[in-house]
Amino acid sequence: MFSWLPFSCALLLLQPLPARSLENAYTAEVGKNAYLPCSYTVPAPGTLVPICWGKGSCPLLQCASVVLRTDETNVTYRKSRRYQLKGNFYKGDMSLTIKNVTLADSGTYCCRIQFPGPMNDEKLELKLSITEPAKVIPAGTAHGDSTTASPRTLTTEGSGSETQTLVTLHDNNGTKISTWADEIKDSGETIRTAVHIGVGVSAGLALALILGVLILKWYSSKKKKLQDLSLITLANSPPGGLVNAGAGRIRSEENIYTIEENIYEMENSNEYYCYVSSQQPS
């Protein structure tokens, strides 16, 4: 019974100690750069730790399908120049940048930080998905099934991340779906149409106002000229009342002369009969 105790202890020692292992998902488009973060805290200034990057899950030791490896100071192996470490190497930033990714770069990647001591490595697993760019299908040319571009996030190198969103352009019937960009375009066209209408209405009102002012000014000037002409005509014509009065006075004097002559002739009728009239025989 006791002979099995050393053997059981040996089996326990051979089992791998638990290491920190996380899996994160990242997405990039074909032809873009993919950024897979991995870092550690440097134990002391100038004391760096070897790391390895491999494609596939982290094995018990080292990395499977190694794409990049470092020692304490330099990169000792690189599968291709597409695999680069662009972080601060001396501050423990071992993030991997894969340039110009293809669909074959999809999969799980293992970042293994090889701290001194048995079974003391720190492992980090990251899942990379590579997608193709969305294809824009013109309206009216799609028949049958359409190409759908779901929103995707592209993480680029650096301290932050850059997000690019692609939207669905057509449904299954080939009908164009209104996107945010289309709504902005339609809104811009509506605004421009409203501005044109407003400018046209304003110009029409201004023209009507100018014509009204000109017509009113012309009418006032013509009315004033007519008034001045009437005053001049009245000033040049003789007064009709005075003319009529003079004519009436002359006729009255003639009648008086006629009456006086008739009276004179009637008083001397005993001597002879004579009738004098101032009127000429017809």
Swiss-Prot record:
GO biological process, one term: negative regulation of interferon-alpha production
Membrane topology annotation: Single-pass type I membrane protein
Primary site of residence: membrane
Family classification: Belongs to the immunoglobulin superfamily. TIM family.
Disulfide-bond pairs as recorded: 38-111, 52-63, 58-110
Localization per record: Membrane; Cell junction
InterPro entries attached to this UniProt entry: Ig-like_dom, Ig-like_dom_sf, Ig-like_fold, Ig_sub, Ig_V-set, Immune_Mod/Transcr_Coactivator
Binding-site positions, a 1,2-diacyl-sn-glycero-3-phospho-L-serine: 62, 112, 119
Species this protein is from: Rattus norvegicus
Extracellular side stretches: 22-194
Keywords from the named record: Adaptive immunity, Cell junction, Disulfide bond, Glycoprotein, Immunity, Immunoglobulin domain, Inflammatory response, Innate immunity, Membrane, Metal-binding, Phosphoprotein, Signal, Transmembrane, Transmembrane helix
Residue ranges constituting the Ig-like V-type domain according to the UniProt record: 22-131
Topological domains annotated Cytoplasmic: 216-282
Name of protein: Hepatitis A virus cellular receptor 2 homolog
